[in-house]
Amino acid sequence: MEIEYTIEKSHRRTLSMEVKPDGTVMIKAPKFVSDAEIGRFVSSRSDWIEKTVKKVLVKNAGLSEVERMTDTELRVLKRKARAMIMPLVEEYADLMGVTYGTVSIRAQKTRWGSCSSKGNLNFNCLLALCPEGVMRYVVVHELSHRRHMNHSKTFWSMVEEYMPDYKEQKLYLKRNGDLLMARL
């Protein structure tokens, strides 16, 4: 089977590939890598690509029919999310003894939250549509990065200390995340 893919060249150092939710294959490559080398890279991973594309298409079947939010609905959801998330950030930062910078609420299609090296926190507005425990988990997860900017055992121990049932919350996001993010 001939594998179709798009190439994105940048100042990166390594080759990588990603299967997008719509089943398209994106190859990310350093500017100095030739198209022939990229072709060999794709060929060497063709079995994995075919299997992954099929899995992604089955998993995301029907997501294109999900009703997208309007700009107005997104603005309202962002305000609601901020009102729900800020008290949790304040509560857990105090409890965990960590500081943070600015807090942003965004409509992100791939992340539930993030923490920069400067301590700035970003949260997905879609968290407002999740159970409160899930929202608490994402807040604890991001604030734990204020002590551990990685996903080491120590990091996960800290998450578990403040959110003993974090695995359940994480599972909720794994099971429902694609459907929620399809609304953006």
Task: Give the ranges of each region predicted by the language model.
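Walker B catalytic acidic pair
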Residues: 142
